[in-house]
Swiss-Prot record:
Disulfide bonds: none
Protein name (record): Asparagine synthetase domain-containing protein 1
Active-site residues (renumbered): C2
KW Amino-acid biosynthesis (keyword) present: yes
Asparagine synthetase domain mapped to chain residues: 277-582
Keywords: Amino-acid biosynthesis, Asparagine biosynthesis, Glutamine amidotransferase
Organism: Danio rerio
GO molecular function: asparagine synthase (glutamine-hydrolyzing) activity
CDD domains: Asn_synthase_B_C, Gn_AT_II_novel
GO BP terms, alphabetized: asparagine biosynthetic process
SUPFAM superfamilies given in the database record: Adenine nucleotide alpha hydrolases-like (SSF52402), N-terminal nucleophile aminohydrolases (Ntn hydrolases) (SSF56235)
Domain Glutamine amidotransferase type-2: 2-183
Length: 612
């Protein structure tokens, strides 16, 4: 994980990086920072990088080779490029890029990379800058244009201006990689970018370029598909949109939700094989993400015996439970695993006024008063739904792996702290997104990833701060396996055909809905978000299956949605968590209850406007 930035001024007069942006970048990369300014073809270019050490030896960035090529890399290579355990992927990638003699070589190399990434690469021989994000946009990259100063900026994270109308930051669309020629510029403040799009290559189908959406860009910006016809090969196959006539009628009579009902599906040999294949590909995705970690020195290990290297955003729901069960397979048995469970303080429900009817039994009045007092004593303002399911999930994991130390971290947030940190940090990280949903999820994830909470293993609460640099999240499961309530609504109104169309749109828009924001939020703590459900092999496997094999929304909630994943949970030995219906994080953590109940998720959120 790194914070990377590039400021291109089309004159030799350098435009400095905004101070707040520079500060936010340093939060992402606490281990090493460096700025380099170059004058290139009458342009002034600032390269700024801030490194979080995750792999191999600590490698400062921007990283230059002997010929002047320069790489700013915010990513993890999990496949497609040969790397030894002790090697740093930034060094290996720069070496490979430096050997490229053409645009075709660069595009071919980037097509091979598996894992999340965003990058900026200065190719000195061509006097050009390459930049972009991976196919899903799992790493944040923003851009901002200033035609008056004839400059533009690329950055992992921005800063919200006091006057929201002045903001010009946007997320770089992950529809491909971009090339900017520093020798082909004018002083009138126009910016022309060549696009090398992601395209799925198939021998039996014509290659079609997806439409790139660059909405809201200023008139001075032009993005044109490269004239050479070069493209990056999509790392995943298109979704199987076939409509299967097969149904699971043999299980429809078992309308009650129980683990035994789920086990009945596994009596089908083909279904059981499909579930095993999903477990295998998902387990490998988790393995890649929990084993590529920098080694701690001996002194640090001895002082932090109970500190985990891996943390999981954990609600006790099926997505996070499966990640925890699979992480248990690949983390050494003597290493703890942190389970990050966030709750926002609930207000105690007010008791309705007592009826003053004549002749009411005084004994009953006393009994009611005693019961009310007892209820108030029992009330815990942080016993939100995700806390309750989280504790139940913790018990399942202890039963599954009793020798593992599971650190269930109860992260409790008051409204006062929420208001304070939203203004100080979170509004800048969510930016340029600005909806009520972005606010709710951004705040919930920020506090969860910070990892400051308590562990209630003993009689007394123990303050605990998670130091895990890797944070696993369950993003991608709902989008691929029909986990959202809107999927059930679409199925109800439009049948399986409508559901197939809805899911086909989901992954295409996930980068603009979630991933860049969540990367900025988690990265602010000097930690790295990793998304096993969006591993290229996992997505390709699921895309290859008919939708009817992944979900059956004719079955009840808690069974039909994400059916294949629920069967995997049963196969892994999990219990009632396999039957939990989807509960959105903003509702499960109860952050949504703290705000205006009349707001819609898509409304612009006034709370994200900074007043500091």
């Amino acid at each position: 994980m790194c914070g990377i930035c590039c400021v291109v001024s089309l004159t030799t007069q350098h435009n400095p990086l905004e101070e707040n942006v520079h500060k936010n970048l340093k939060h992402r990369g606490p281990n090493c920072s460096k700025d380099i300014t170059e004058e290139i073809s009458n342009c002034s270019v600032l390269f700024s990088a801030h490194v979080l050490h995750m792999r191999g030896c600590l490698t400062p960035q921007p990283l230059q080779d002997d010929t002047g090529n320069m790489l700013l890399w915010n990513g993890e290579v999990f496949g497609g490029l040969k790397l030894e355990q002790e090697e740093n992927d930034t060094e290996v990638l720069l070496h490979q890029l430096s050997m490229a003699t053409s645009a075709s070589d660069i595009v071919c190399l980037l097509s091979q990379l598996e894992g999340p990434w965003a990058f900026i690469y200065y190719q000195k021989s061509e006097r050009c800058i390459w930049f972009g994000r991976d196919f899903f946009g799992r790493r944040s990259l923003l851009w901002k244009f200033n035609p008056e100063r004839a400059s533009f900026t690329l950055a992992s994270v921005a800063s919200q201006p006091a006057d929201d109308s002045q903001s010009q930051w946007q997320e770089v669309p992950p529809g491909g990689v971009y090339r900017f020629d520093l020798t082909d510029t004018s002083l009138d403040g126009t910016f022309i970018f060549e696009l090398y799009p992601w395209i799925f290559h198939s021998d039996d189908k014509p290659i079609e370029s997806p439409e790139l959406k660059c909405e809201g860009l200023p008139r001075c910006v032009s993005v044109n598909t490269n004239s050479s016809g070069l493209y990056l090969t999509s790392p995943v196959c298109p979704m199987n949109t076939s409509i299967s006539s097969l149904t699971t009628e043999q299980n429809h009579n078992a309308s009650q939700t129980s683990v035994e009902n789920l086990k009945a599906f596994l009596t089908n040999t083909d279904k059981k094989a499909m579930v095993s294949a999903l477990i295998d590909v998902l387990s490998e995705a988790v393995r890649k993400r929990v084993q590529y970690l920098p080694a701690r020195d001996a002194l640090e290990v001895s002082l932090n015996q109970t500190k985990a290297d891996i943390a999981i955003l954990f609600s006790g729901g099926i997505d996070s439970m499966i990640l925890a069960a699979l992480t248990d397979r690949h983390v050494p048995a003597d290493k703890p695993i942190d389970l990050l469970n966030v709750a926002f303080k609930m207000q105690e429900a007010k008791m309705p006024p007592k009826s003053m009817k004549k002749g009411k039994n005084k004994k009953n009045d006393c009994d009611d008063a005693d019961k009310t007092q007892l209820d108030q004593q029992k009330f815990n303002p942080f016993n939100v739904p995700d806390r309750i399911t989280g504790r139940a999930g913790l018990q399942e994991l202890k039963n599954l792996s009793p020798k593992r130390q599971w650190n269930f971290i109860e992260i409790n947030v008051t409204q006062e702290e929420l208001v304070e940190m939203r203004q100080k940090r979170i509004c800048h990280l969510v930016h340029p997104l600005d909806t009520v949903l972005d606010d709710s999820l951004g705040c919930a994830i920020w506090f969860a990833a910070r990892g400051i909470g308590v562990i209630n293993e003993a009689v007394d609460e123990e303050l605990y701060i998670s130091e895990a640099k890797v944070v696993l999240t369950g993003i991608g499961a709902d989008e691929q396996l029909a986990g959202y309530s809107r999927h059930r609504v679409r199925y109800k109104h439009s049948g399986l055909e409508g559901l197939v169309r809805e899911l086909a749109m989901e992954l295409g828009r996930i980068s603009s809905r979630n991933l860049g924001r969540d990367d900025r939020i988690i990265g602010d703590h000097g930690k790295e978000a990793r998304f096993p459900y969006l591993d290229e092999d996992v997505v390709s496997f699921l895309n290859g299956l008919p939708v009817s094999e992944k979900a059956d929304l004719s079955l009840p909630r808690g069974v039909g949605e994400k059916l294949l994943l629920r069967l995997a949970a049963v196969e892994l030995g999990l219990g009632l968590s396999a039957l939990l219906p989807k509960r959105a994080m903003q509702f499960g953590s109860r952050i949504a209850k703290l705000e205006d109940n009349h707001e819609k998720a898509s409304d612009k959120c006034k709370r994200l406007v900074t007043t500091i």
